Design a protein with these regions (language model features):
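Bacterial Sec-dependent N-terminal signal peptides
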Residues: 1-28
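Membrane-proximal, proline-rich intrinsically disordered regions
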Residues: 19-70, 74-75, 104, 115, ...
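Conserved, well-structured interaction surfaces
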Residues: 77-152, 158-197, 373-378
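Internal, well-ordered domain-core segments that constitute the primary functional module
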Residues: 173-256
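Hydrophobic-face positions in mid-chain alpha helices that act as interaction patches
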Residues: 233-390, 395-396, 401, 405-454, ...
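C-terminal functional modules
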Residues: 395, 413-533
């Protein structure tokens, strides 16, 4: 039976949320339940689904970050074409809506987590759930801070007590508070106490895995600060490693969606629409990277459609996945017949089909059908990411144990293993993954470049576009050539943040203006936030 989410008036300030979707059909409606009788376990899947929903489909990253960091590419352009936000940095008809969805939905998730924290506070039988509530708040609020910069934090989620116009806290203070809260909450998780009973992660309440997740999240947030505050990064990265981070792909944090029950994979839903099937392709940057080392993932993730427009628009016909046949679409081109027409791109391979069935982009690689699976997982944090971050931590001189080379090898293999969660069609044999990692070891002279390019590829291929973008901002890798399409909103630079929701300027004006005053260049797409050095 489909269930409804809990309606809570806990949202930050006076946020106006966009329309709900299928993921809002999860929990039994307990709006008449008293706090003394309501089971806060019911809130956990709402938090988890809202968070992954904030980072999937048309709620933002596929329409922005996926092409900003050149994982995907698209020939769509113009005000009516939503991928112009991403591929060409050009405003579309709904950009103002799209750019506020991560804010709105992740604050919604954080509000559920805050309520779960309050309902479990001081109750020994719910102590583990209390810790999980704090960890999930950190996951959601960090995602908002990564995307926008300074955000409401100390006064956020307080509408029930009358605070509807919250002040903005600096990204620095938010991060340092989150790291401390994660540490305290993760340390408090106790395998001897009752487990969470309504967990949408694959953990199903397993306290040992939640503990690893908390420390792995701490590691990720610590490494965000590697350039902005190396001392804090080192302290918390070392604490995370000592506490115990992910140790295998079985620890991956993800939500397994189920379209038949009304909460499908929003990326799969997007990539199953006719326009997306046809005009969303893998970027040349990504395909060239995978081909440069004969990465075995290439034959699992990319295909060239059969010849002709009809085949290119087919959602059910598999294409040619032979690695040698794959060609990535360069970002920044269109089908408009002018100087930026795809036919003018360097090395243009020509189209396929003839007459009414002709298509100029028919030889470019698109995502395979594993990505059109509406019941595929939505990843939050993986073992592969954790190992690659540990590799970088070693390179930076942090005392996290192990060698950079071994952590890197583990991360490379894990990235291939995690891909199998999309289905049997994405499985890479363990021997193949190991042989690839052995043939492509970490080279000391290029260590940071190698590690972070692998991180970009792994998160991108797992459709975690916001994480690929955030780590690119932090590390500078891969080195990308920006698009400078006519009429773009970033002066030909790759966007480094999303502007605040328009409602903040009109409803929370004074606090919004204070926050904007701290941004060099103002509330635009290229102002750098505190940790983005």
């Amino acid at each position: 039976m489909k269930k409804k989410l809990i309606a809570l008036s806990l949202l930050v300030g006076a946020i106006q949320f966009s329309c709900t979707d299928d993921l809002d059909l999860l929990n039994t409606d307990p709006t008449k339940a008293a706090a003394s009788t309501f089971d806060p376990n019911l809130l956990l899947p709402s938090i988890q689904f809202e968070h992954v929903n904030a980072n999937a489909g048309y709620n933002g990253p596929i329409l922005f970050q996926s092409m900003w960091v050149q994982v995907l590419a698209s020939t769509t352009s113009g005000a009516a074409n939503y991928y112009s936000n991403a591929d060409k940095y050009v405003i579309s008809g709904n950009t103002n809506d799209y750019m506020q969805r991560t804010w709105n939905i992740d604050y919604k998730a954080a509000s559920f987590a805050y309520e779960m924290e309050q309902l479990t506070k001081g109750k020994p039988a719910l102590a583990n759930l209390n810790s999980i509530a704090i960890i999930m708040q950190a996951q959601c609020l960090a995602a908002i801070a990564d995307t926008y910069g300074d955000i409401p934090y100390t006064q956020a989620l307080q509408a029930k007590t009358g605070t509807t116009l919250p002040v903005y806290d600096t990204q620095e203070s938010v991060y340092k508070s989150l790291l401390t809260r994660i540490e305290t909450a993760t340390n408090a998780l106790n395998p001897s106490s009752p487990i969470a009973t309504n967990d949408a992660f694959a953990y199903k309440g397993n306290v040992a895995q939640w503990k690893k997740y908390g420390y792995s999240l701490m590691l990720k947030l610590a490494m965000r600060l590697a350039k902005a505050d190396a001392a804090t990064a080192k302290t918390f990265a070392e604490k995370a490693a000592a506490g115990g981070v992910f140790s295998s792909v079985n620890d991956d944090a993800y939500v397994q969606t189920d379209d038949s029950k009304g909460f499908g994979n929003a990326n799969g839903q997007a990539l199953s629409t006719l326009a997306d099937v046809y005009q969303v392709r893998w970027s040349k940057t990504m395909i060239d990277y995978l081909k440069s080392t004969n990465d075995p993932r290439l034959g699992k993730v990319a295909e060239v459609p059969a010849d002709g427009l009809v085949a290119n628009q087919s959602m059910t016909s598999a294409g040619n996945s032979t690695p040698a046949a794959q060609i990535g679409l360069p970002n920044g081109f269109d089908l408009n017949g002018g100087t930026t027409d795809i036919s003018k791109a360097p090395g243009y391979p020509g189209g396929t089909g003839a007459g009414a069935d002709a298509t100029p982009i028919g030889k470019y690689s698109r995502p395979t059908m594993i990505y059109r699976n509406r019941s595929a997982p939505l990843f939050v944090l993986t073992y592969a990411e954790t190992e690659l971050l540990l590799a970088e931590a070693v390179v930076r001189g942090f005392n996290v144990g192990g060698t950079a080379a071994q952590h890197y090898k583990n991360g490379v293999i894990a990235g291939m293993q995690s891909l199998a969660k999309f289905g049997s069609g994405a499985t890479i044999d363990a021997a193949v993954a190991t042989a690839y990692a052995d043939a492509n070891p970490l080279v000391t002279a290029n260590a940071l470049k190698q590690i972070n390019e692998q991180y970009w590829a792994t998160t991108g291929l797992l459709m975690n576009f916001s994480e690929a973008w955030n780590n690119w901002k932090r590390s500078g890798f891969p080195v990308l050539t920006p698009v400078n399409y006519v009429g773009n909103f970033s002066n030909g630079a790759i966007p480094r943040r999303q502007p605040y929701p328009t409602g903040e300027a009109t409803l929370n004006t004074a606090n919004y203006q204070t926050a904007v005053g701290k941004l060099t260049g103002g509330d635009n797409w290229v102002s750098r936030t505190w940790w983005d050095k």
